[in-house]
């Protein structure tokens, strides 16, 4: 099977020349090239910052540090076909949502081509597809056994019978399922489909390990999305990462706005990938996983809560089913927790295979203790009305 990216990416986008400016060639000296305000920021408290200058459009320092970390933690060190990631394999976006939109625009002709999603899944794939007038095809995860794994045979049948599908989105670990999709299943699709790209969204991967990012050097039809919003605790800076072949990363970098990553986002992202802060991220992820198991034990021991969690334990949240799938009770519990106890969780009962389910993010030890107390009190009160 020979993969040719030119058959996937829209021709004008494949040949797109990126925006260039004088700052690409010269970064020091008296900078009079970009029509900036050389007098500095107008807020007095920002006068000593460099915020009157446009940010670095390439972010090479961050890209180099991030790919170095993914290489260090790679599960594929013994696979000779997997090469080290470099900055050339990375494109940055304003959160993963910008990356999702860019990939759809790059590969799918509006009003003609399609994407494939695996519900229950992250809704932004469909939102971005609809905005771009792209049809959404669905192939559900295996919900009957509660595993929420990919039905690879069904997926391949759909892909091989519909040549207009150009992208397949896999959320791993899943949202709202919390289940990591087995890499072997993803690889089977990669090995048997060359008419599009498999996009693996790994927002929660640091809570379970085993990122597919290094595999983009082995499979040219693989794209891996990650973010600093979850394990790194930097949701506020909105920085997403797209790992791809150097060929595809070049195209995505040509498509992006010239200065899409702000100076402040860049500053904090660079701090996040310092060795000491990477260790802190790993330690915090471990604490979250420990608290997740405490929450699981406490909540599934309650009356009116199913004694088995739904989906997986691979993210920073739990999916808990109320009273055998009682959407009415689950929705009341969701509302009462927020309005009476100041605890906001997420009702997910309308998602495929998630009837009666609440998605609960793992908080601090104190927040989780508060949740457990009021969850029990509120649930028992509502169930006995």
Swiss-Prot record:
GO terms for biological process: L-histidine biosynthetic process. GO terms for cellular component: cytoplasm. Pathway: Amino-acid biosynthesis; L-histidine biosynthesis; L-histidine from 5-phospho-alpha-D-ribose 1-diphosphate: step 7/9. It catalyses: L-histidinol phosphate + 2-oxoglutarate = 3-(imidazol-4-yl)-2-oxopropyl phosphate + L-glutamate. Its cofactor is pyridoxal 5'-phosphate. One of its GO terms (molecular function) is pyridoxal phosphate binding. It comes from the Eukaryota. The keyword Transferase applies. The modification N6-(pyridoxal phosphate)lysine is found at residue 230. It holds the Pfam family Aminotran_1_2. The keyword rRNA-binding does not apply. Keywords: Amino-acid biosynthesis, Aminotransferase, Histidine biosynthesis, Pyridoxal phosphate, Transferase. It is an enzyme of class 2 (transferase). Its EC number is 2.6.1.9. Belongs to the class-II pyridoxal-phosphate-dependent aminotransferase family. This is Histidinol-phosphate aminotransferase. The lineage of its organism: Eukaryota, Fungi, Dikarya, Ascomycota, Saccharomycotina.
